């Protein structure tokens, strides 16, 4: 049975709960939770599963009174949401924030930069040891969580978090690739296979009207991106990417990256059977295949949804 630990506003453990309903999500969006429990919890308290990634800070309370009975529903940010509410700004006089070095050192400096070093401890991976971040340039004024995930992804890594002993440990470790080694009986999935995606992206940058910087990027039938067009007529799908104030070099880089992002093979919702023993992390890759239709979709886990009801914990995943 799942047990949820609740602290007070000073983050001192107060109770271990078994009777509660929880809906938490983190990854590409949401990064928050909703907790229904018959107990008063102070604003600013932590709720968490010991040693796990699921947890966060209580920010709100909804009190629903019906037939003389109150239902208390608390809302809050997951640890990931706390990071997502902080912005990584360039140093004064600099156009971009650039980092490199040992992952724990880099992550620790970024955590301190956004004022969350009182909550998070940057550590080496407990299973894979120290990792390295090659020179990485953040998008201007990106949120800290998105920036950290993208930095890790650019280095073949994923971002991990776990609450233990009053602190949230945060680290980077290599991405796991789950392919044909997974027994299809252990997972269910809803997969949408997209054969034709946007393959011509027009980037619009600095300037006005005829003086505006314009670049063109193309994807071929296999999703390879370049400035050479191969798909035309009914097969050409064109979109505009507005990246105002960008000069040509930056506009080319961002338009290329955007078109690469649009080349996802499809969308996948993955449900792992409770007794499978399989645990994905945001950033891992998975291959979903239905032998009947022959549909195979390679996707990256972009979201993790944890729910608890009647003492039973379930985990779903979003992938793209």
Residue ranges and their predicted role:
Residues 37-49, 278-289:
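Short coil-to-beta transition motif at edge beta-strands of beta-rich domains
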Residues 38-119:
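Surface-exposed cap/loop segments at beta↔alpha junctions
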Residues 1-27, 62, 184-191:
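Solvent-exposed edge beta-strands and adjacent loop segments
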Residues 69, 96-104, 137-145, 196, ...:
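Solvent-exposed, acidic/flexible segments
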Residues 66-71, 78-81, 121-207:
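Short beta-strand-centered interaction patches in the first periplasmic/extracellular domains
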Residues 95, 176-311:
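Acidic, small/polar-enriched beta strand-loop surface segments
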Residues 47-75, 160, 287-312, 317:
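Short beta-strand and beta-hairpin "edge-sheet" elements
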Residues 23-39, 70-82, 203, 264-274, ...:
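Oligomerization/assembly interface segments of phage tail-like spikes and tubes
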């Amino acid at each position: 049975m799942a047990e949820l630990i609740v602290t007070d506003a000073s983050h001192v453990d107060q109770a271990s709960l078994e009777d509660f309903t929880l809906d938490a999500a983190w990854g590409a969006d949401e990064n928050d939770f909703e907790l229904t429990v018959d107990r008063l919890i102070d604003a600013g308290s932590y709720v968490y599963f010991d040693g796990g990634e699921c947890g966060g800070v209580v920010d709100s309370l909804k009190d629903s009174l019906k037939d003389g009975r109150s239902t208390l529903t608390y809302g809050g940010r997951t640890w990931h949401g706390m990071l997502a509410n902080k912005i990584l700004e360039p140093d004064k006089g600099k156009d971009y924030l650039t980092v490199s070095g040992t992952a724990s050192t880099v992550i620790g400096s970024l955590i301190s930069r956004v004022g969350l070093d009182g909550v998070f401890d940057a550590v080496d991976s407990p299973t894979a040891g120290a990792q390295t971040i090659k020179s990485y340039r953040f998008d201007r004024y990106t949120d800290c969580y998105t920036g950290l995930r993208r930095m890790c992804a650019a280095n073949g890594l994923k971002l991990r978090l776990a609450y233990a002993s009053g602190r949230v440990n945060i680290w980077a470790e290599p991405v796991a690739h789950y392919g044909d080694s997974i027994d299809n009986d252990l997972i269910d999935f809803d997969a949408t296979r997209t054969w034709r995606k946007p393959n011509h992206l027009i980037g619009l940058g600095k300037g006005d009207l005829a003086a505006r910087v314009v670049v063109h990027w193309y994807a071929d039938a296999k999703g390879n991106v370049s400035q050479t067009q191969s798909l035309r007529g009914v097969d050409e799908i064109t979109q505009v990417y507005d990246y105002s104030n960008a000069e040509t070099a930056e506009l080319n880089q961002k338009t290329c990256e955007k078109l690469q992002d649009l080349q996802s093979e499809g969308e996948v919702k993955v449900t792992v059977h409770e007794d499978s023993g399989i645990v994905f992390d945001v950033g891992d890759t998975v291959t979903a295949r239905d032998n009947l239709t022959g549909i195979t979709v390679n996707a990256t886990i972009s979201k993790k949804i944890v729910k608890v009801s009647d003492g039973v914990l379930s985990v779903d995943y979003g992938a793209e």
